[in-house]
Amino acid sequence: MFKFALTLTLCLAGSLSLAQHNPHWWGNRNTIVHLFEWKWSDIAQECESFLGPRGFAGVQVSPVNENILSAGRPWWERYQPISYKLTTRSGNEEEFGDMVRRCNDVGVRIYVDVLLNHMSGDFDGVAVGTAGTEAEPSKKSFPGVPYTAQDFHPTCEITDWNDRFQVQQCELVGLKDLDQSSDWVRSKLIEFLDHLIELGVAGFRVDAAKHMASEDLEYIYSSLSNLNIDHGFPHNSRPFIFQEVIDHGHETVSRDEYKDLGAVTEFRFSEEIGNAFRGNNALKWLQSWGTDWGFLPSGQALTFVDNHDNQRDAGAVLNYKSPRQYKMATAFHLAYPYGISRVMSSFAFDDHDTPPPQDAQERIISPEFDADGACVNGWICEHRWRQIYAMVGFKNAVRDTEITGWWDNGDNQISFCRGNKGFLAINNNLYDLSQDLNTCLPAGTYCDVISGSLIDGSCTGKSVTVNENGYGYIHIGSDDFDGVLALHVDAKV
């Protein structure tokens, strides 16, 4: 009997873990966008007016729980919890719930960035949160939850990143480190996440997951409620989990400890795609992109060109400040069938701590748009760049097809097909790409969705005529505005 019960328990745990890799997308949609620091009311409007019509699958939103008020209102104050009340600079609980409902109604899922590892760092005296809650972080006193000192690990600093104990039980940059093995802490975290599930979210991005023991996270995840069927989720659906685990390949705490609990952020993807499109690695090598590069299996990898953290760091990672290379890298990211794709939507920054666009009272301001739909008032909105939202449509059109017809020039010009539904070509050389290439598409004329749009049967950008053998003449000049060309069956003239 014991053996049967143990087997049943293991099977249930395995099935729950597998279910936590499912992002619950509508139809053929398969791209998440991180609307970093947006207000809930603006996200709701964006779902209805842009993301839904453009085929985006979901939105990662900034942390929803009450956070400390920091001088100047830097973005990172959102990562310093005071309580689990749903009041932040982005809005209150009513506005959050309205946003989730409206986005779900148009097929755009919501994934919340959640902070399970810690509470706020030290603050002189009494700290006040965005909902008016008082706390004394230096005493580990957070009455808004409530947490007291006994709910935290003993104070210590991470000085050796190769020491598992320090990484998982000491304070990350001074943030008060919760003890996730505590029954009380577990109950409060589960209560917080279950409340968000009741409001209709589809899942969670778990911040600083590597700083928590995987067995503690497994307990918390497995204790969560199923997703709310009133928001269109099938019965017994589990929340999608993707976990921030920075693993460059030599870490004491490995991504492999978390990959079976849910997806894991694949930081090596971000670094290597940046290296390639910055010219430090020839694009021809991308033919084997994926696990051959040491990446996680596709269904366990949350992939991105940049995120809100590493876009602010020096190094290989690309961001909006290198737009031509960034758009090429994003096109490759969304065209190549590897990983669970997320694109970044940023605000402009001059230094690491730059706050989101705000008014004189330090309230976040809504994005404004020009005649082309691009943002103009401090918001970058990469997701509204035609070259990026068009590739979201490309990715939808070619879903469930494989790479075929790979071509390269032995250097930095490449092309490939996605079955007989899509074709991508990239030129990252300092000379033109001018070549008859196999597009694998049915005969006809296709609109290049990078340089233009198909409107009322006419293409506003380049077009390519494909012959009966699937070949078309592809030209990408070295001085063209964009170094990429994309065709697919839903953009046939």
From Swiss-Prot:
It comes from the Eukaryota. The record marks 309 as: Transition state stabilizer. Its EC number is 3.2.1.1. Its main location: secreted. SMART domains: Aamy, Aamy_C. The gene is Amyrel. Belongs to the glycosyl hydrolase 13 family. The modification Pyrrolidone carboxylic acid is found at residue 20. Midgut and fat body. It catalyses: Endohydrolysis of (1->4)-alpha-D-glucosidic linkages in polysaccharides containing three or more (1->4)-alpha-linked D-glucose units. GO terms for molecular function: 4-alpha-glucanotransferase activity; alpha-amylase activity; amylase activity; metal ion binding. Its cofactor is Ca(2+); chloride. Disulfide bonds join 47-103, 156-170, 375-381, 417-440, 447-459. The active site is at 207 (nucleophile), 244 (proton donor). Ca(2+) binds at residues 117, 168, 177, 211. InterPro entries: A-amylase/branching_C, A-amylase_C, Alpha_amylase, Glyco_hydro_13_cat_dom, Glyco_hydro_b, Glycoside_hydrolase_SF. This is Alpha-amylase-related protein. It is found in: Secreted.
